[in-house]
Amino acid sequence: MNQSLLVTKRDGRTERINLDKIHRVLDWAAEGLNNVSVSQVELRSHIQFYDGIKTSDIHETIIKAAADLISRDAPDYQYLAARLAIFHLRKKAFGQFEPPALYHHVVKMVELGKYDNHLLEDYTEEEFKQMDSFIVHDRDMTFSYAAVKQLEGKYLVQNRVTGEIYESAQFLYILVAACLFSNYPRETRLDYVKRFYDAVSTFKISLPTPIMSGVRTPTRQFSSCVLIECGDSLDSINATSSAIVKYVSQRAGIGINAGRIRALGSPIRGGEAFHTGCIPFYKHFQTAVKSCSQGGVRGGAATLFYPMWHLEVESLLVLKNNRGVEGNRVRHMDYGVQINKLMYTRLLKGGDITLFSPSDVPGLYDAFFADQDEFERLYVKYEHDDSIRKQRVKAVELFSLMMQERASTGRIYIQNVDHCNTHSPFDPVVAPVRQSNLCLEIALPTKPLNDVNDENGEIALCTLSAFNLGAIKTLDELEELAILAVRALDALLDYQDYPIPAAKRGAMGRRTLGIGVINFAYWLAKNGKRYSDGSANNLTHKTFEAIQYYLLKASNELAKEQGACPWFNETTYAKGILPIDTYKKDLDAIVNELLHYDWQQLRESIKTHGLRNSTLSALMPSETSSQTSNATNGIEPPRGYVSIKASKDGILRQVVPDYEHLKDAYELLWEMPNNDGYLQLVGIMQKFIDQSISANTNYDPSRFPSGKVPMQQLLKDLLTAYKFGVKTLYYQNTRDGAEDAQDDLAPSIQDDGCESGACKI
C-alpha cells in the first residue's frame, strides 16, 4: 500500500495517510469477534484508496469492505462493520468518538430547533445529569450493521437535505424515555425513565418508526396506524381525503373504509343524475395517499376496504392487476375484501352470492358488522325483493376471482368481519369494527366524517410497540416489560398532537394500544419447536396467554392509578368478557395447553377498576425495527439464514440470531410443506390477541403438479384460517425461486412490505 498518499481531513487540512491508525481502529472493532480477519478488510479497502481521498470516504470504504464480508460462515462481520459505522457516526454527530454530556447536547439541539424545547422546561439540569448516569454508550457496540444503517437512515435526528446527523442511538433511547414519562410525578419518573431506557436499549422492547424518529423532536404525531371511514356523500368523501393528506404527511399508514360508497349507476338526488361508482373516488383517495413522501422516512401507503357483496365487486377485485387500462385500474393502493360466515356458507354449499349497492339495501351494511343474524335475515329478504337492483354470481366464481387476484398481486387482503366483531374487545352493538388498517393487524371502531372538523366522526389511531421474544429468558420477564410498554404508550397518547378532532376524540376516549412481538422464529428455534408440525402449538398458547394476561394486568393497574378510559363502557371487558371467553372453539382440537394465570381474579379486578386502554395487543409486521434489534420479523419464519434488505442506504445483510448454534433448529419459510401449521399458530395467537394479526399465506408452485397452485388449495387455506378464528390475512407470498437461494451470493431479499413501513414497527 502506498504510504505517501495524501488524505483530506474533516476540517479540510491534508496529511499523509496513516495506515497504522486505520489498523488500530480495525483491531479495536474486531476485538472479541469470531472468524473475522482485519487484513481481509484492509486488503479489500486499500485498493479503493486514491490520492486526496477524504478521511470520511476512507471510513466509509472500510465499513463497506467489512459489510461485504458478512456471510453465513462469518456472521460476526456484521458486528465489525457495525462498530466501524458507530465510530464514523459519532465522529459525524459529535466531531469525536466520545459523546458529550446529555444536558449540553440537549441544550444545543433545542437551540438548533432539532429537539422539542419542552425537554428543558420539564427536566432540570440535575435530572439530566442523573439520566446521563443511566446511559450505557457501550450498548452501541451490540448493534448489527443492518441496525446501524437503519438508525442512520430512518431514526436518528438529522437534516435529510444535507445528510448531517445530530445524535447517537443511546441519546435517542434515553430522550424517548424522558419525553414519554415527563408528566409522571417527579419522585417516580426517573425510575421509569431508567427502566424504560434499559428495556429499549437492550432490545427487549421494540419501538415503531414514528416513535423512534419523532419523539423528542417538535413534530408530535406518533401513531403508526390511522383508520378512516368514509360515508356515502361528497362531503364525507372530501373529508376523508383531507384526513388522508394530513396523516400521510405525518408518517402514518392509512386504512380506508370505502365500503359505503354507492355503486355505479345508482340514482343521485332522486334520479337527477346517476352515480359514477366507486372507482373515480378510489382514484381520488390514491392521489391523496401519494401526495406526501414524508421526508425520506417513508412514502404514503394505504389499504382500502370494501364488502364482498358490493355490486361493483368484480370491477374492484381487479383494480391492482397489470391488465386493463389506466381508467379502470387503481394500482397504488392495496385492498381488503370483507367476508363473513354467510359468504363462506354459500361457497361451501355451491350457492350464489347476491351483489347489492349499499345505498339500495337499508340496514344491510351496518348489520354486516354489528349483527350476523340480522345481516342474514336482511340479505335473504333483499335477495327476494324484485324491486331492488342486484346481481347474482356463483360463490365459487367470485371467491376464485378474489383468490386469483390475491395470488397474482399478493396484495389483496382478507378481513373476516364476523370474527372481528364476535371475538372483539368492543361491543358490536355500540362500537362495531368496520375496517382494518394498512397492514391488517388493527381492528378498531370508526365513524365517517362529514367534514374534516366533524366532532361526531371517529378516526381510529393505534400506537404500536413489541416485545422481543429473543431477548427474554422466561415468560415471567414479560410482566415488567408489559408495565413499561403500556405506561409509555399510554403516556404517548397525551403527549402527541392530533391534527383532526375526530382522531383526538377517539384516541382520548378509547386509548387503544397495539403491542405485539418480534423474533418469534428465534423463540421457536431456541425452544426446539417448528412452525409446521404442531410442536409449537402448546408453547405458542402459553406464550401469548402470558403476553395478554400481563398487558391486561398492567392496564388494569394503570386504571386504578389514573382512571379507566372514558369509553370503557363500550368494551366487552366492561361486561367481564375476556378474549379467553369468545375464541373459536375449533382451536381446542389442536392445542391441549391449560391456562396458567389467574384470569378469574383479573376479570373481577377489570370489572371493578376498568382498563386504561380499550385494546392492548396486535401482531404487526416488523421488517424495519426487527433489524434494529437484530431479530426475525414479527411472527414470520425467516426466508433464509442470511436476509438481504434493499434499502435506500444500499444493500443490508442480516444473519438470523444465534445462527451458529441454532442453524439446524430454524425452520425456513420455504421448508414448510404447507400453510396448515402456520395458520394453526396464528389461530392460537388470535385466541388471546384482542385486535388482529398480520398473517401471511405462502405458496411454492413447484410443490404442485404442473407447477401451479390449484385454486382448491387457495380456498382450502382460506377456509382453514376462518375455521381457526383468524380475523385477517395480509400478504400472499409466492416462491419464484430467485429470492431465497441459500448460498451467500444470493441470500433472501426482503422487500419493504407495505411501501411506507407504517403500521409495522
Identify the function of each model-found stretch.
Residues 157, 164, 171-189, 193, ...:
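Function-dense linear segments that define catalytic or interfacial modules
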Residues 124-151, 440-446, 489, 493-494, ...:
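Catalytic alpha/beta core of large soluble enzyme barrels
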Residues 77-113, 149, 339-341, 420-451, ...:
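Terminal amphipathic helices with adjacent charged low-complexity linkers/tails
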Residues 44-45, 63-65, 79-87, 199, ...:
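A glycine-rich phosphate-binding loop feature that marks nucleotide/adenosyl-phosphate handling sites
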Residues 1-3, 36-174, 178, 191-197:
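Core nucleic-acid recognition elements
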Residues 13-17, 164-167, 187-191, 211-217, ...:
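Alpha-helix capping and helix-loop boundary segments enriched in small/acidic/polar residues
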